[in-house]
């Protein structure tokens, strides 16, 4: 009589753990791809700012691309948070009590991954045909408005971020702006003649002191 092999019983918890592992692998894959996509889009954003130095903040493509980058970052964070939530459910001793929540959470996680996958399709078309992407733009705006509770004006924050990028690309322009904003001395009263003479004497004395301290150093060399 041969010994019968014992049949391995796979529990619902085992299946849930397997699903979480699959989700984790998918999220890691999409994270790498999305990070690379965001780097490319940030480079495109800088190019657009260079090409539109005067009206980059009012340029529809510029604003749309920056919002899209924020949207992608938000999706990645959502996917990561959802995965942590699922892992916590699986680790509970009473998995049956949260099984329904787990299944719903898994569905939500898959929906997020579908949205991330959509970001890789027709990237150039989305950039070149912004006017025809009304539904997509609305989805981005609604998602960001829900995720940025407490932010008084998201559009103002976009302006500040674009200004920071423009300053990074054109530091000389920013320095010139700082100089232009310095208070002017025009119209201020001149120093009285006696004070001008004293100031001149102090400057000459300081110059002589500097030259005196340099002479011993020259002798030592």
From Swiss-Prot:
Major localization listed first in the record, in broad terms: membrane
A GO-annotated cellular component: endoplasmic reticulum
Membrane topology field: Peripheral membrane protein
Annotated region described as Disordered, given as residue ranges: 170-221
Protein function: Class E VPS protein implicated in concentration and sorting of cargo proteins of the multivesicular body (MVB) for incorporation into intralumenal vesicles. The lumenal sequestrated membrane proteins will be targeted into the vacuole after fusion of the endosome with the vacuole. Acts a component of the ESCRT-III complex, which appears to be critical for late steps in MVB sorting, such as membrane invagination and final cargo sorting and recruitment of late-acting components of the sorting machinery.
Biological process per Gene Ontology, one example term: intralumenal vesicle formation
Designated name of the protein: Vacuolar protein sorting-associated protein 20
Compartments, as annotated in UniProt: Endosome membrane; Vacuole membrane
Disulfide bonds: none
PANTHER family in UniProt: CHARGED MULTIVESICULAR BODY PROTEIN (PTHR22761), CHARGED MULTIVESICULAR BODY PROTEIN 6 (PTHR22761:SF5)
InterPro entries hit by this protein: Snf7_fam
Lipid-binding residues (covalent, N-myristoyl glycine): 2
Extra remark beyond the main annotation: Present with 937 molecules/cell in log phase SD medium.
Keyword line: Coiled coil, Endosome, Lipoprotein, Membrane, Myristate, Protein transport, Transport, Vacuole
Coiled-coil residue spans: 72-178
Subunit structure, interactors included: Core component of the ESCRT-III complex (endosomal sorting required for transport complex III). ESCRT-III appears to be sequentially assembled as a flat lattice on the endosome membrane and forms a transient 450 kDa complex that contains DID4, oligomerized SNF7, VPS20 and VPS24. SNF7 oligomerization into a membrane-associated filament is nucleated by association of SNF7 with VPS20; the process is terminated through association of VPS24, possibly by capping the SNF7 filament. VPS24 subsequently associates with DID4/VPS2. Interacts with the VPS4.
Gene3D superfamilies: 6.10.250.1710
Biased composition (Basic and acidic residues): 197-215
Family, per entry: Belongs to the SNF7 family.
